[in-house]
Amino acid sequence: MENRKAGEFFITSISLTNQHKESVEISKLITGFRMYESIFKKYCTAEIHFIDGLNLIKNFRFTGQEYVRIAVKMKVGIGEKADNLDSVDKVFRVYKAGSVKRLNDTTQAYVLNLCDPHMFSCERKRVSKVLRGSYDKMLQNILVEDAKIPPSEFDQWESTVPENHQMIVPNWKISKFID
């Protein structure tokens, strides 16, 4: 009989890509992995714990522009992988490499903290304008025109009524406007 736990998954791929478009598969180096999605936060975040014997921080030319692609599939049945609808394939941006511990002369362990790439643009960009229309049209306007998020990335969009609201946005970050 197989010993199964709720929420088990298969890591299909975890790859690290630097600003020079060089990519390395790091899924075999992972010792811990957490991905967070909250109804109280606007962005997905993740953290990866791994042991590095290749000295990736130096040899892979870390500069703060790295991306990590995480692809996982849920476990369904006995040892079977879920279809693509029930899987996660997401790109994150590395915003912190921390908790560095040297294990021996050639090996170190550390944590990469990751966030949704849109978090950077929404926290950096400020908006000053007057918006008119329904709340959903105002939000979509800001996300598409100012945050440069293509409408194809919206998984779900609900229309709101009435359509005759007016809002003044006084030099707010896009993240504050979303709240």
Each model region followed by its residue ranges:
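Charged- and aromatic-enriched interaction segments used to assemble
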Residues: 103-179
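Assembly/oligomerization scaffold segments
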Residues: 1-126
